[in-house]
Swiss-Prot record, chains A, B:
This is tRNA(Met) cytidine acetate ligase. It comes from Streptococcus uberis (strain ATCC BAA-854 / 0140J). The lineage of its organism: Bacteria, Bacillati, Bacillota, Bacilli, Lactobacillales. SUPFAM superfamilies: Nucleotidylyl transferase. GO terms for molecular function: ATP binding; ligase activity, forming carbon-nitrogen bonds; tRNA binding. Catalyzes the formation of N(4)-acetylcytidine (ac(4)C) at the wobble position of elongator tRNA(Met), using acetate and ATP as substrates. First activates an acetate ion to form acetyladenylate (Ac-AMP) and then transfers the acetyl group to tRNA to form ac(4)C34. Pfam families: HIGH_NTase1 (PF05636). GO terms for biological process: tRNA modification. It is an enzyme of class 6 (ligase). One of its GO terms (cellular component) is cytoplasm. Its EC number is 6.3.4.-. The keyword Protease does not apply. ATP binds at residues 7-20, 96, 152, 175. InterPro entries: Rossmann-like_a/b/a_fold, tRNA(Met)_cyd_acetate_ligase. The gene is tmcAL.
């Protein structure tokens, strides 16, 4: 039986994700972001709710990406997630994409020319953002055309790159329905962005998400629930450059902007530049919010839930890797757990996220 | 003409304070806490409002105590404040007290025996709180009876101690009306505690404070407006012992208590012990809130306001000391100004507290 790995955020889980899981083959392992996501913001609902939605709709195992993998630029995000899936025994990597490309060929090229490609990046002008640089790299070495540039496209290329040398079969799955950033509501498969935007429109949420009740009943948050805390952090710390990825330049920009703004979006607008993209600034604000430091990744893999079929696989994996299924006095990953504590501050109904919580078990035939 | 110095918090200003100012002689200089007060909490209204109330009711000059003088145990508070008043040319120190004691004699004893008295403190058991120790010290060396122990009594003794060797005439003024901590409303002169407690009772506030409208119209805060920020600080910082007066023991106690409490008062209750008094814990929480460090005191004296009579005196003083009347790009005291920024976070209507603000001028005949 194939073991398919899928990297996901499910922010929130919707019919597009369900379709992706249906297209994937064999046992399906999802490596999912925890309570903070790649674009640098809190997830709309907590990791347990999102894991349960996934398990009720096709996933067999959901494991958690540590904070410092989940909140990273595309390359680090993909690398960290693919490493975990590979450790978990995946032989196939399935991912959504808007483009019909030969990703295996792209991975092969990267495997062959990784050094030249990395060297090429170094030669590019520093006025370009990192995404712009990688785009130029792919264009030069593979001839890909970025005219239809989309976030999933960039992520898919990052997966190809991350799986180079890993003996993983790549299975791109063409996305159905709305594009990633679409805020349109009138589509069969609404995007996660549209659902977050219209989360208070119950009818729309019921139409566009399976297991909708889980989503609707969970405490929902967005960046603005954390604005006061971020502002306080920036104002109260004389130095900010102990925080991961904060340099003196960005610290100064944040310190002078913070006294004039009233929301995270205003702050991001004021601080972002061509080189400091909005996504990068949002990630930096997330690092500041949770006071992130440069840290080692945890050794164990934290399991959020599984089906019976998934449980069989976990039993086998336990012999060779460290599976963390319940976090007690010894932390799994201090950084992620601190981030979770702070995530809880965004809404008084968010439950304890780690200590003593057991994986979700979905009883169904494998 | 006598120049009388008065140490005050005016939290808020009431008829008892007005009486004290009336009893004082000559030019009246008040050294007042800024936005955080000695017992370790945010002042109910900002320093500008409190200074204006004082200037409208008898004070000639109001200068600001730097944060690290204002939020300190009685001895350091008194010492820092008396030093500033002495620098400002005060020859008399007036203060309220419940006890008719010969404070000049007490100051004389301290002047003579300071070393023995300090050595005596060292011999006392560490299970005693600092206030308990100083109480024993005064009992042993001066025979004072502490049966009617009150905060003002302790402060008055601290003033006596602080003025030792300073050539300051001590003028104790017997308090009228309610005792310091009284929460009773039915008294001619209500205590500041009672007024804070019943701040939403407009009739009571009008009865017990002069210049009531200033108080009633100002944005009012209390500790609970800052609970979310303190909780966030404790949760997000792996180490707390970089904060002034936070040691490993108190840091651990705070870290384990914070996940179980829902208010500052609950937190103080959980963390305080016989040795860590509630006042000390509140001060520590204030240090954490504003991220205070051990710092040097500022050189200049920050003037919050003056009458015409006060202005004459300031002109003379300017020749020998640094008077800061407007804070621009160069900070007066970074710690105080950071504390003020954070004070502002407690209520969205609190105005900028430092940058570009000029002293209050009250036009009246000297």
């Amino acid at each position: 039986m194939a073991v398919t790995g899928i990297v996901a955020e499910f922010n929130p889980f919707h019919y597009g994700h369900k379709y992706l899981l249906e297209q994937a083959e064999g046992l399906k392992i999802v490596a999912m972001s925890g309570n903070f996501v790649q674009r640098g913001e809190p997830a709309i609902v907590d990791k347990w709710t999102r894991a349960q939605m996934a398990l009720e709709n096709g996933a067999d195992i959901v494991v958690e990406l540590p904070f410092q993998v989940a909140v990273q630029s595309a390359d680090y995000f993909a690398q960290g997630a693919v490493d975990i899936l590979s450790t978990m025994g995946a032989d196939t990597l399935a991912f959504g994409t808007e483009e019909d490309l030969d990703y295996s060929e792209i991975a092969r090229i990267y495997e062959e020319k990784a050094e030249q490609m990395t060297a090429f990046l170094e030669t590019l002008d520093d006025s370009l953002s990192y995404p712009q640089k990688t785009q130029k790299m792919w264009e030069s070495f593979t001839g890909i055309d970025f005219s239809g540039n989309t976030p999933n496209h960039i992520l898919a290329l990052a997966y190809a790159k991350a799986s180079a040398g890993k003996n993983l079969r790549l299975q791109p799955i063409k996305r159905q329905g709305a594009a990633y950033h679409s805020q349109e509501k009138n589509q069969m498969m609404a995007s996660a962005t549209a659902i977050r935007k219209h989360i208070s429109d119950r009818t729309f949420v019921l139409q566009s998400t399976p297991s909708s009740e889980l989503l609707l009943m969970a405490p929902q948050v967005n960046w603005e629930n954390y604005f006061d805390l971020v502002r306080y952090h920036i104002l109260s710390q004389e130095q900010l450059d102990h925080v991961f990825q904060v340099n003196q330049e960005i610290a100064n920009r944040l310190k002078s902007a913070i006294v004039h703004v009233h929301s995270i979006e205003e702050l991001v607008d004021k601080v972002s530049t061509k080189r400091y993209t909005k996504a990068r600034v949002r990630r930096i604000l997330t690092y500041i919010l949770v006071n992130a430091r440069e840290n080692n990744l945890p050794n164990g893999v934290h399991v959020l839930g599984f089906t019976e079929k998934g449980q069989e696989h976990l039993k086998k994996m336990k012999k060779s890797i460290s599976i963390v299924s319940r976090i007690g006095a010894v932390p799994w990953d201090q950084q992620t757990q601190t981030a979770d504590r702070i995530y809880q501050l965004g809404h008084s109904d968010i439950k304890e996220q780690n200590f003593g919580r057991s994986p979700i078990r979905i009883e169904k035939l494998g």
